[in-house]
């Protein structure tokens, strides 16, 4: 299989209260930056042949150096991200298309991952890549542990309670056949439409292509708030013991 990973790592971590424009991807877990763990998983996934990273301008050279020194040979491109996450993914898609136009083989599938999710496992990446080729799109998710309620029309009060059995919490990496993801992003760019994840774009522009669920456990967290850091250290320790 020939799949390319896009890692969106341009976030400044506003909810982490880091200040000074620091990036949550550069916080350390187990002695290594969050983004190091993220890249390592894709480096070790057999399905992934190339990795494109979009990050803040001031971190481009840092990540290139990190990849080189860590032996992350699949990292072929580190570029500046955009204003929004979707813009960063779009920058990587354009880079992939430019490389294909220059003679490099176009990947069969593209997986888009959050740089702040360091605990996805190589075998999970391979499974999502395979499902995305088989079904056109595949997205990891897990079942919510809490009851989910809608916000009501009256400020400060709940509305209806949703049936938890019909809900999933969506994660990344989200995998797609390359042409589906590329066309969805191109159409969204033409319309100036933004979504919170790539699956939402594919749902809109390819409604006849249902997205295959890949159900995961609860280890694949996104580091978003300060409370996530001790949890991340615990997950890292647990996963390290299993290796």
Curated annotation (Swiss-Prot):
Annotated keywords: Isoprene biosynthesis, Nucleotidyltransferase, Transferase
Record's keyword annotation contains Transferase: yes
Coiled-coil intervals, chain numbering: none
Catalytic activity, EC: 2.7.7.60
PANTHER family, alphabetized: 2-C-METHYL-D-ERYTHRITOL 4-PHOSPHATE CYTIDYLYLTRANSFERASE, CHLOROPLASTIC
HAMAP family per UniProt: IspD
Protein name: 2-C-methyl-D-erythritol 4-phosphate cytidylyltransferase
Organism from which the protein derives: Chlorobium phaeovibrioides (strain DSM 265 / 1930)
């Amino acid at each position: 299989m020939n799949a390319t990973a896009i890692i969106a790592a341009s976030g400044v971590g506003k909810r982490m209260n880091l200040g000074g424009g620091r990036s949550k991807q550069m916080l350390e877990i187990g002695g290594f930056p969050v983004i190091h763990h993220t890249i390592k998983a894709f480096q070790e996934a057999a399905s992934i042949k190339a990795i494109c990273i979009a990050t803040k301008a001031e971190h481009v050279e840092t990540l290139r150096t990190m990849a080189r020194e860590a032996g992350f040979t699949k990292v072929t491109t580190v570029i500046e991200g955009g204003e929004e996450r979707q813009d960063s993914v779009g920058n990587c898609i354009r880079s992939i298309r430019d490389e294909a136009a220059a003679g490099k083989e176009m990947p069969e599938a593209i997986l888009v991952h959050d740089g702040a999710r360091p605990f996805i496992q190589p075998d999970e990446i391979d499974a999502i890549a395979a499902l995305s080729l088989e079904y056109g799109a595949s997205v990891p998710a897990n079942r919510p542990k809490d009851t989910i309620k809608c916000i009501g029309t009256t400020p400060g009060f709940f509305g209806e309670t949703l049936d938890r059995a019909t809900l999933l919490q969506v994660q990344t990496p989200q995998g797609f056949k390359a042409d589906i993801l590329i066309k969805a992003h191109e159409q969204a760019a033409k319309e100036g439409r933004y979504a919170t994840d790539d699956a939402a774009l594919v749902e809109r522009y390819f409604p006849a292509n249902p997205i295959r669920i890949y159900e995961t456990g609860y280890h694949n967290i996104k580091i978003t708030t300060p409370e996530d850091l001790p949890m991340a250290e615990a997950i890292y320790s647990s996963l390290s013991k299993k290796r």
